[in-house]
From Swiss-Prot:
Its main location: nucleus. WD repeats lie at residues 104-142, 143-185, 192-231, 250-288, 290-329, 335-375, 379-417. It is found in: Nucleus, Nucleolus; Nucleus, Nucleoplasm. GO terms for biological process: maturation of 5.8S rRNA from tricistronic rRNA transcript (SSU-rRNA, 5.8S rRNA, LSU-rRNA); maturation of LSU-rRNA from tricistronic rRNA transcript (SSU-rRNA, 5.8S rRNA, LSU-rRNA). Required for maturation of ribosomal RNAs and formation of the large ribosomal subunit. This is Ribosome biogenesis protein WDR12 homolog. PROSITE patterns: WD_REPEATS_1, WD_REPEATS_2, WD_REPEATS_REGION. GO terms for cellular component: nucleoplasm; PeBoW complex; preribosome, large subunit precursor. CDD domains: WD40. The lineage of its organism: Eukaryota, Metazoa, Ecdysozoa, Arthropoda, Hexapoda. It comes from the Eukaryota. Belongs to the WD repeat WDR12/YTM1 family.
Length: 420
């Protein structure tokens, strides 16, 4: 069997975790030159023999990586012996997200965050905007005196929404929105940073938020309506000025990314080429991961406990904060043609994430497919500055073309199908 030359047959076992698509667990002899096209044809033929199923599109994993070319080339690259049967796992292909809306703004959109049926955006004209996820503009909010850099929701119910924004004006601002009357009040102006505030993240319980700044500092603040700080001056309370609960020093350049990993642990990424994991109970650094590029964004998945970075090159990188070899890259994802500005894991799909870059493109990835994204999400006419997948139904992104692009993901597409 001359599989090394891309000829002959290979013995395979076909496995799936989706029981409705299972085929008999027996060895199959297939040509070494097969691709996903031929494997799809083969598996669907077996399923038709089994129960008359209609055709389904599948992706195939060989040794935990998506098959993107010929099977023999994949095995050769992995230095896999052809003596034993090869296990191929197949999964139903994730459907391509569909463009839904283009939300027009007056300036660059540098921050987006979706929650429930609402989208919050922040712009370089210093304004915040609220939209429905169906594309209706609800409100423009003024208050900051310099471009917005980051936003996050604190809480949301039928009556009230609360959120935080950060800006190059060196402040974070806490807002309370009355949904019924569509009125917004600034609850507090958070002062303490000495340069622009680049990143923000609200704690899982909604009681605190963290900010990262060009002053290299990480600060933790109360997100409660009454921050309950004993001894705060009457003047500060009446003026709505809020000061940080904790200030953490350790980065040498801008703290461009911050995210709560759990109730007492924070992840930060910086232009100083490092990721840091902070233990708030000790108020110190728990883990440091050195990288070889400035980090523009970082995302931690609570589902798989891995970290992705977007950096000052064309690549995304995957790290495991639990390993003793903290500087070792677990995987590199190739596909963008310019600096990658923003990245975010799915909150519901363990292996999926999205990215946006200076090549004007968003991409949807599976972390088991490092050589190519699953899909390109086209529409932006200029650099992408921020991307969000907080709402499992929608992928939203903002960019230099003054727009927010909204794409329906699988959950929204499934709901559309059910209502037809």
């Amino acid at each position: 069997m001359d599989v090394d030359n891309g000829e002959g047959q290979v013995q395979v076992h076909l496995k799936t975790k989706q029981e409705q698509y299972a085929v008999p667990d027996v060895p199959y002899a297939i040509d070494g030159t097969v691709t996903t096209v031929e494997l799809n044809t083969f598996v669907n033929a077996l399923l038709r023999q089994k129960d008359g199923s209609s055709d389904t599109d599948f992706d195939f994993l060989v040794f935990d990586e998506y098959l993107r070319g010929r099977l023999c080339d994949h095995l050769r690259e992995k230095a896999i012996s052809f003596e034993d049967a090869i296990e191929i796992e197949y999964v139903e292909r994730f459907p391509a997200p569909e463009p839904q809306d283009c939300l027009l703004h007056d300036d660059w959109v540098s921050a987006v965050k979706a929650r429930g049926k609402w989208i919050l955006s922040g712009c370089y004209d210093n304004s915040l905007n609220l939209w429905t996820n169906k594309g209706k503009h609800i409100l423009t909010i003024s208050g900051h005196t310099a471009p917005i850099k980051a936003v996050d929701w604190i809480s949301l119910d039928e009556e009230t929404g609360r959120f935080v924004s950060t800006s190059q004006d060196q402040t974070a601002m806490l807002w309370k929105w009355n949904v019924g009357s569509n009125a917004v009040d600034c609850v507090s102006v958070c002062k303490g940073h000495e340069r622009g505030v680049d990143s923000v993240s609200v704690s899982p319980d909604g009681l605190r938020f963290a900010t990262g700044s060009w002053d290299t500092m990480l600060k933790v603040w109360s997100a409660e309506l009454d921050d309950g700080v004993e001894g705060s001056s009457k003047r500060m309370k009446e003026s709505g000025v809020r000061t940080p609960k904790i200030t953490l020093q350790g980065h040498r350049e801008s703290v461009s990314a911050v995210q709560w990993m759990d109730a007492t642990t924070l992840l930060t990424g910086s232009w100083d080429y490092t990721l840091k994991v902070w233990d708030l109970s000790l108020e110190g650094i728990k883990t440091e991961i050195s990288t070889n590029k400035s980090i523009f964004d970082a995302s931690y998945s609570k589902l798989n406990r891995l970290i992705l970075t977007a950096s000052a090159d064309k690549n995304l990188r995957l790290y495991d904060p639990r390993t003793n070899q903290g500087s070792v890259v677990r995987n590199t994802y190739l596909g963008h043609n310019a600096w990658v500005q923003t990245v975010m894991w799915s909150t519901t799909e363990e292996f999926l994430f999205v990215s946006g870059a200076y090549d004007n493109q968003n991409k949807l990835w599976d972390c088991r497919s490092p050589k190519a994204p699953l899909y390109d999400l086209l529409g932006h006419g200029d650099k992408v500055l921020d991307i969000d997948w907080s709402n499992p139904k929608y992928i939203v992104s903002g960019g230099v073309d003054n727009t927010v692009r909204v794409f329906k993901s699988r959950k929204a597409l499934a709901e559309d199908t059910e209502t037809k």
